[in-house]
Amino acid sequence: MAQLSFNAALKMNALGNKAIHDPTNCRAKSEGQMMWVCSKSGRTRVKMSRGSGGPGPVVMMSSSTGTSKVVSETSSTIVDDIPRLSANYHGDLWHHNVIQTLETPFRESSTYQERADELVVKIKDMFNALGDGDISPSAYDTAWVARVATISSDGSEKPRFPQALNWVFNNQLQDGSWGIESHFSLCDRLLNTTNSVIALSVWKTGHSQVEQGTEFIAENLRLLNEEDELSPDFEIIFPALLQKAKALGINLPYDLPFIKYLSTTREARLTDVSAAADNIPANMLNALEGLEEVMDWKKIMRFQSKDGSFLSSPASTACVLMNTGDEKCFTFLNNLLVKFGGCVPCMYSIDLLERLSLVDNIEHLGIGRHFKQEIKVALDYVYRHWSERGIGWGRDSLVPDLNTTALGLRTLRTHGYDVSSDVLNNFKDENGRFFSSAGQTHVELRSVVILFRASDLAFPDEGAMDDARKFAEPYLRDALATKISTNTKLFKEIEYVVEYPWHMSIPRSEARSYIDSYDDDYVWERKTLYRMPSLSNSKCLELAKLDFNIVQSLHQEELKLLTRWWKESGMADINFTRHRVAEVYFSSATFEPEYSATRIAFTKIGCLQVLFDDMADIFATLDELKSFTEGVKRWDTSLLHEIPECMQTCFKVWFKLIEEVNNDVVKVQGRDMLAHIRKPWELYFNCYVQEREWLDAGYIPTFEEYLKTYAISVGLGPCTLQPILLMGELVKDDVVEKVHYPSNMFELVSLSWRLTNDTKTYQAEKARGQQASGIACYMKDNLGATEEDAIKHICRVVDRALKEASFEYFKPSNDIPMGCKSFIFNLRLCVQIFYKFIDGYGIANEEIKDYIRKVYIDPIQV
């Protein structure tokens, strides 16, 4: 076939699937050849010929009767004494002719790789330069610092930090407001602008700026009532600012109904604060500068951090300095003004938050493998400051916050650090609701996203993680439904994490989603908006795009090799099976370039396993399966003369492949591993024989019997052993069983495969006469149970298995190569994806098609 464009080839394939995969043929052979032809109701020996008109219907000449029959593409009338089933799967979407048309400049040109290498160096420099944190200026906080007074030599007051006042004077935006010009949030602009106007008015300067700022505030105050959500502690801080503005004679509409409502709300909070004066962190620290009139300044000093700040907040610290004259407060603020050039950020230091956020960002973008050492250094730093109380933005933070703590829990656990989920209990009230930090009764949306992602990594019986999940999932789903935030990037992230939690998130799919929604001008919100330049970073995004496309180009070359092998081996002509080369390749979930040999071996073996599964389920008789299995046990191709030719061909292709891959294993491991490799294959085919015996006898096993057999026949054992031996790490004989069958983690992943598969395939299998499934076996054991009861039970079993598998994966094991362990563990991902909605292997032309296109076919625009 001549080379077509990719889209043309895909279109032709879609139109031609039925004809190419005629279910009446086992293997399509040349005219005049003798062959077995297998229909869904039987098998016969035929000679291939065509009518005199040239291309047209196939005429099959029976060697036993001499009769002929024209077979249409839907015919299934060839009958003998051996009944056959047909699953009627759709054809291969990504067959040889489609994949071979793929072209990409990212493989041939060295320019892209050279630029990627340059970016890696620059981002490593960024890691190495991490200190106490890099963060954008805050007009709100700088204005508070500008308001601090000192006594001059003549006894009059003057600004103690004139550089801060100068910054406020020089940084008004064109619309009269202060803030981050590219991002408008009403609460943010009102806080920044009102306090800036106050600072200028206190020192009777910047009259033009005050006039413009006042006009902006007056126009926008009326819009507050339309806001769906106010920024954290806005109802405490903003009314206090308005009181100060009114005292200074700034002309604003103070009698607006919503402003009165805010003032009433604040008064109620002040009453609560006064009643709980001994519990200062729980009620004051997050909005300290909004509580001046009820503050006991002597008591508050015991909550000062080592660096002199209060909750790392320049605004709160400036307020304390104004009321106490504390020198440590002065030193903290003065150091910030020097560091940031006359202004201050909304919080400092942020050394823990910045390191965790940078690592999380890098890994989400799919480029973490370039920075393994830098990530380790960053996380070692965070772990040194980890506390069972949780952590805050910086190492000296006295009050932990949920966002940093949950992010720390997730990131540290992902990298094998010993951290307890009990730390989350510090952010939960008696009703099971979580809050952002001590003293707050609300929770920020971003904190809930991080909490949800942390709960993904739950181990068995971790109550704190279960509580986090119960709280976070409905909260996020409700946020999506009600659109309580206008932050597009955050909403896209919420959509992804809710739809594809950790046990369902293929790394390349996650990277593609994150890259597509990445905003290199992203802002976060505390009291006001802020940026972290290490995260709002175009270099990270550029590298992620280049890296994705470069790796994708390698994957395309591998897919070309694999589809070519599938075709040249003759397996593409076997028509009782699903042809799923690209789907099996996707299932490995291992994308790194150095694991090319692993992916190729896994895909070749996995494709044959799909074929064997269909052969056992819908084609072979029990005697044929036994003969096939005997050939596997004896490692002998001469025992197969009694089975159909197509089964003989499948055996020979498999036999040759295993021998070839074993030769590659010998080169990596330095010894012959065939004895290890044969064991899981024998177990695998023995289970198929057992299943067929049960089927032919009409026996439905108990749930326990079912799992012992069917969790093996799902096939992870034979399709993973050789691939992990090709990962470049030496695997000792005694370690094989620790990472592979019968290790706990391996059995748990296999269990999740088997049962998740059952929830989406049992009805089709039942229609074919295959009664045994996890659902049927559970119902047999539990009389009166419905299919719905069985599926709920199976989902609970799978959930438990995934938690236990996580525990086994993160459990320290110095003798087990981490790459091998990760390969086995990551196989849990694809089954959750493939069987999320439907049987994704049987019906791969819907959701799975889109995954494959995004990961392997469509490059990212650079």
Curated annotation (Swiss-Prot):
GO terms for molecular function: magnesium ion binding; taxadiene synthase activity; terpene synthase activity. It is an enzyme of class 4 (lyase). Coiled coil: none annotated. Binds 3 Mg(2+) ions per subunit. Keywords: Lyase, Magnesium, Metal-binding, Taxol biosynthesis. Mg(2+) 3 binds at N757, T761, E765. A motif (DDXXD motif) lies at residues 613-617. Catalyzes the cyclization of the ubiquitous isoprenoid intermediate geranylgeranyl diphosphate to taxa-4,11-diene, the parent olefin with a taxane skeleton. Belongs to the terpene synthase family. This is Taxadiene synthase. It comes from Taxus chinensis.
